[in-house]
Amino acid sequence: MAGRLIVISNRLPSEAAPSGGLVYALHETLRKIGGIWIGSHPETTETPSESLSEYGDQGKYTRLSFSLSPEDYKNFYLGFSNSVLWPVCHRRGDLVELGRGFERGYSAVNARLARQVMKVARPDDMIWVHDYHFF
């Protein structure tokens, strides 16, 4: 692989050594080959930035965070991602809850994140978009 591996997930690994599962596997891979992990900042802000922020260097790879407003968190994360997509992706249509602004909030966050990733991605980078938060 000529370029960097860029992992995009809803959350960043919060520990220096994540415990088990896919997060651990990706963390160890990035520690060996380098790259970037992009995920949401753990705290909301009234004015989300149009740029990614460095969240801490993990040795050979960098963690970058994107910010969410309380409204983004409500509509993108709690709303469309967790109340619509999660139930649909897990064959639990009976749990789907629709709300005003869910789809619009989801689309806005994904569009903003796409613009942010374009600022750091290089043509030869491999981008791994993980999970339904970023369909």
Predicted stretch roles:
Residues 72-126:
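Conserved nucleotide-sugar donor-binding subdomain of glycosyltransferases
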Residues 1-72:
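N-terminal low-complexity, Ser/Thr- and acidic-residue-enriched intrinsically disordered segments
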Residues 4-6, 125-128:
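Structural motif
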Residues 131-133:
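Short His-centered aromatic/hydrophobic patch
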